[in-house]
Design a protein with these regions (language model features):
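N-terminal active-site beta-alpha-beta segment that forms phosphate/nucleotide-binding
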Residues: 10-96
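Conserved phosphate- and dinucleotide-binding cores of soluble alpha/beta proteins
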Residues: 1-13, 81-177
């Protein structure tokens, strides 16, 4: 990642090139974004779900939503990828303990979360990716207290897909997670 002046200077505007989506992630984010309604408090988890604000901007509704991330930023547009955890033009930056007070109190209307694995019973693992133990972070508090949770992911690793005018074509389903 590189220095992004738009993160520290309100006069500096980020461009749509700073936040772009392609391929399968674009399709997943467009579907996930259909759950958004005006004036929602929206939490975004790390990974796949960080693209929801990009689609909200494209659809012209981002300014009618309150995005929140567990690191404490509220009211701006979260960064994506390895820069996730920062936010463009937040209206507030809270101590994460206070942010979680809001989450645990049921303040979130919707949470978009990624996952490592989901089994046939709907149990979700968010803490281990293959042999890498990342921990659950705020997943438990957020998923258990948000009014609605949308899990964002592909259910498969090493799959091969192609975006066509007709939709998504999966040529190799890969390994299911």
């Amino acid at each position: 990642s590189t220095f992004d002046k738009a993160l520290v200077d309100r006069k500096e505007q980020y461009t749509s090139d700073d936040l772009n989506l392609t391929g399968l992630k674009r399709i997943i984010m467009r579907r996930a974004s259909l759950e958004l309604k005006e004036n929602m408090f929206v939490n975004l988890g790390y990974g796949m779900s960080d693209g929801v604000p990009i689609v909200a901007q494209e659809e012209g509704i981002a300014d009618k939503l309150i995005f929140m991330i567990e690191q404490g930023s509220t009211g701006g547009i979260p960064t994506t990828g390895l820069n996730f955890g920062a936010m463009y033009n937040p209206t507030a930056i809270l101590d994460d303990g206070y942010q979680f007070d809001f989450f645990q109190g049921g303040g979130l209307d919707i949470a978009y979360l990624g996952f490592a694995q989901i089994d046939q019973f709907g149990n979700v693992n968010s803490s281990r990716f293959g042999n890498i133990l990342t921990g659950c972070g705020g997943f438990i508090d957020i998923s258990q207290n948000a009014k609605k949770v949308v899990f964002c992911g592909s259910f498969a690793v090493k799959s091969q897909q192609e975006i066509t005018p007709e939709g998504l074509e999966i040529s190799n389903s890969g390994k299911f997670t």
